[in-house]
């Protein structure tokens, strides 16, 4: 009996230690994922590519860097709106003479408008598109403590679409465009009461839900289990955003 009790206590202690470790690791990863200022962990060399699973291409990156510099420096109007929850959100308006359409562009996770759209901005300009490049909440000059992975940004997308129609009218068709998390943002906004002038959505490399992308990163990129970690991540998400990580999906929208 004493031996059995000892084995049981040892097993329970090991399980508790394992659970505590998963809890701690998950909280750190959620800070990396959601915080405006990520922990030092993400700033270490190679950590970002490990999280995203991206394989760097130096030639492509060099071209993107130069195009990003040119886009950021190009003359344009800095604009702003207030989100539904009272945050100051920044945007960059690039009008096109004799425009045929308007694009509202949303960048991705821990990125920037002039980086994600650097290499396509020239094409949009040549195709006579006026473009509003949005700075997503909790990034760059937009307020907010937490990145919402589309759960909160979808409402910001609606607000920006309404701002465009209020300022410029509804004569031109509006297209919502997004890359990565920005792609998820515009897709999740599809079931909201968007202005009738919104005629289409362009989404590149979007994921289906925060829960799905966190599970993918944990299993495929970091090679760690997600059963208990997923439950903890959802609790953190609910506490910070007041919405569950799987309550909205691009497939449902």
Regions found by a protein language model. Give the residues of each.
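Hydrolase active-site cap/lid region
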Residues: 188-252
């Amino acid at each position: 009996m004493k031996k059995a009790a000892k084995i049981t206590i040892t097993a329970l202690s090991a399980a508790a230690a394992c659970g505590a470790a998963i809890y701690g690791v998950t909280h750190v990863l959620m800070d990396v994922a959601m915080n405006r200022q990520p922990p030092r962990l993400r700033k270490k060399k190679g950590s970002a590519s490990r999280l995203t699973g991206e394989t760097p291409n130096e030639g492509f990156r060099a071209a993107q860097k130069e195009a990003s510099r040119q886009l950021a420096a190009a003359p344009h109007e800095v604009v702003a709106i207030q989100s539904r929850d009272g945050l100051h959100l920044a945007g960059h308006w690039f009008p096109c003479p004799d425009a045929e359409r308007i694009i509202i562009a949303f960048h991705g996770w821990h990125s920037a408008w002039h980086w994600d759209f650097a290499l396509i901005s020239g094409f949009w300009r040549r195709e006579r598109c006026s473009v509003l490049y949005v700075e997503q909440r909790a990034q760059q000059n937009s307020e907010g403590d937490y990145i919402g992975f589309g759960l909160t940004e979808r409402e910001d997308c609606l607000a920006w679409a309404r701002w465009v129609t209020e300022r410029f009218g509804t004569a031109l068709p509006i297209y919502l465009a997004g890359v990565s998390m920005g792609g998820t943002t515009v897709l999740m906004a599809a079931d909201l009461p968007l202005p009738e002038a919104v005629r289409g959505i362009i989404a590149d490399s979007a994921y289906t839900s925060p829960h799905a992308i966190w599970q993918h990163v944990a299993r495929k990129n970091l090679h760690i289990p997600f059963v208990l970690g997923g439950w903890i991540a959802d609790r953190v998400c609910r506490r910070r955003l007041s919405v569950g990580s799987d309550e909205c999906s691009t497939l449902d929208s």
